[in-house]
């Protein structure tokens, strides 16, 4: 049973400057909730309640958000504004939160390796804040992936088809279709040029990883810019037939850029906030 979830959140958020100069990008509001809260709620819905967050300099707001604010709660006690804290209170009651700091920005693989002391020798999920995923017609994306892990007991990565001209923005996979939206991965390339891409199936920010990934990351040589990419370690797993890509059900918004962030905000406003539905 997977219970642990790792949230790499040490990045600078340069695509949202100047807003992120003094505020973590993970705290950017989508309607009235910060981006990171959507990911934590998705994890809890999937049964993952041990939340580990890899932070960096200037990210104290993340820890403050997932904590009790006694002064604020006393101020709004007995008013209709209490309803706005119901969601975060649920997370505080049902989840445990732990933190570690990534002192150097050396890629996603390095960020995941930094979280190793918090995870231990267990399978775990990874969610990237930039990707907000929703499914209006069934289980959330992480719930779908947890169910697949329970069946296959191997690394699961969420993928989606992208415009072939945009493969240079993603890790891209190729493999053998085994039905039901599943691909047994045999090749994986980090941000290939369109003419070099093995397919147009791109990995998004949802992973379930087996604990051997840590050793594989340690053995990975830094690439461009001194960064250690998770794609390289995943490819080593894939060569042993231990990685399945999943074409998830639902929608994904790239909140790392202005266009996707605005689309996500409009979507959540129309489908959740405006209608009064929980989300």
UniProtKB/Swiss-Prot annotation:
GO BP: biosynthetic process; UDP-alpha-D-glucose metabolic process
One GO MF term: UTP:glucose-1-phosphate uridylyltransferase activity
Keyword Transferase found: yes
Catalyzed reactions per annotation: alpha-D-glucose 1-phosphate + UTP + H(+) = UDP-alpha-D-glucose + diphosphate
Assigned keywords, A-Z: Nucleotidyltransferase, Transferase
A Pfam family the protein falls into: NTP_transferase
Cytoplasm recorded as keyword: no
InterPro entries membership: GalU_uridylyltTrfase_bac/arc (IPR005771), NTP_transferase_dom (IPR005835), Nucleotide-diphossugar_trans (IPR029044)
Top EC class for this record: transferase
SUPFAM superfamilies the UniProt entry points to: Nucleotide-diphospho-sugar transferases
Lineage: superkingdom: Bacteria
Enzyme Commission number, as recorded: 2.7.7.9
Stated role: May play a role in stationary phase survival.
Assigned protein family: Belongs to the UDPGP type 2 family.
Name of the molecule in the record: UTP--glucose-1-phosphate uridylyltransferase
Species name: Pseudomonas aeruginosa
Annotated gene: galU
